[in-house]
Amino acid sequence: MKIVCVGDAYITDVMMRDGLRPFLGKDDSVTIFFFGDPDQTVMRDMAKFIEAGGREEIEVPDGLFEAVADADLLIVHLCPVTRRLIEAAPKLKAIMSCRGGLENIDVQAATEHNVIVSNNPAHNANAVAEFTIGLILAETRNICRSNYALKNGEWRKTYPNTATTIKEMTDMTVGIVGYGSIGRLVAYKLSVFGCRILVADPFLKEC
């Protein structure tokens, strides 16, 4: 199998090579490119541009079109995979994305050419779940409001939720819409606080 990888400032070429090494057979070959700028700040702006629909306007690494001509598998992170690139790879069987979103990949073109596209939706799921818990605590305990008031010399005593007793987490019922990788982690973390959890997910018969 011929594998072509395109790393970047976030998922580097070294990371890709090290990650693939345990799974390679003796007949597998790997060609690795580096996409974009080594500065993550620059790449963050480029990612936003790609996600906003600018996929076709970004140049891919030199030599990538030639490399995919006989490739079986293409692995990318932020590098755009356009219709033109897919059509230059007649033997391509699958495109794997190291990120959750697929905005940088022309999924429709891949589908038309019978190329499987897979992503990694759980790669930052725990970070998102932790951030969600943080927001719940900040909102219910008025942490941000208190901080803002103190910075402005005010000792605030009332908040939007002080009309009734402010509930502790253990007394809360929390509804979660969507029970995928992130939803499950949020539910688990909330259960440690003692919350009652209600879940709604149209894709699951029973949660």
Which stretches of residues belong to each language-model region?
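Rossmann-like dinucleotide/phosphate-binding beta-alpha-beta segment
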Residues: 162-207
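Alpha-helical elements of the RecA-like P-loop NTPase motor core of helicases
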Residues: 14, 83-87, 130, 144, ...
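Glycine-rich NAD(P) Rossmann-fold beta1-alpha1 loop
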Residues: 100, 122, 180-184
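An N-terminal-biased, well-structured beta-alpha scaffold segment characteristic
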Residues: 1-116
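Positions that flank functional sites
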Residues: 83, 125-126, 205
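Phosphate-binding beta-alpha-beta segment of Rossmann-like dinucleotide-binding domains, i.e.
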Residues: 113, 121-173, 185-188
